[in-house]
Amino acid sequence: MGWNKFLATLAMLIVSNAAFAEREQSFFMELFGASTSLGIHYDSRFSDYTRWGGRIGIAYTYSRSQDFFESAPERTRGWSFPIAVNYLIGNGRHHGEIGIGISYGLYSCMYHDKAGREVEYDTSGSFGFLDLGYRYQSERGIMVRVGLCPGVALKSYDESGLRNKGVNRAAVFYPYVGVGYNF
């Protein structure tokens, strides 16, 4: 429950900040990285005078890896909601980019039981991630991002102290590519 409040508060700060100031903003599509599969994101600097910014997105996730959840499903698909704070290094059109965030996901998992019947169930989970990459922003508004996104599962516990069966991956390194438009 604490993560949900944190995500909601951070999302409201990013969106409300964008509504009241004129600064560099962008929409971009991301392949892999924090999106896991494919996502659409909004990114904005917190003011005209800072290199600090944030992003919020929605992503479709699809995996046939049995390592995604502790229950080892044969297929996982669903929606995730990455949110992050980032910092741009450098001036002009070429930037190094570092960021830290979390992604919360709602997933549908499928496996076959011992009798061969297909069993489907819903679950949720979250993972923390870093963005370590390069960002190019052209004068015409085109933005390109490439880099690595190390991530680690954030374990959750119920009221009795037992670990929930959320995202179970050990540390992973997802490459990412993003293309979008600055305005």
Located regions from the model:
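Positively charged n-region of N-terminal signal peptides that target proteins for export
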Residues: 1-5
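Sec-dependent N-terminal signal peptides
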Residues: 6-15
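Sec/Tat signal peptide C-region and signal peptidase I cleavage site
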Residues: 17-21
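Extracytoplasmic loops and strand-loop junctions of Gram-negative outer membrane beta-barrel proteins
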Residues: 23-25, 113-117, 159-163
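Short N-terminal segments immediately surrounding and downstream of signal-peptide cleavage
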Residues: 23-36
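Gram-negative (and chloroplast) outer-membrane scaffold detector with strong preference
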Residues: 38-142, 146, 180
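Structured catalytic cores of enzymes that bind and process phosphorylated ligands/cofactors
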Residues: 88, 103, 149-152, 171-174
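Outer-membrane beta-barrel "beta-signal"
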Residues: 169-183
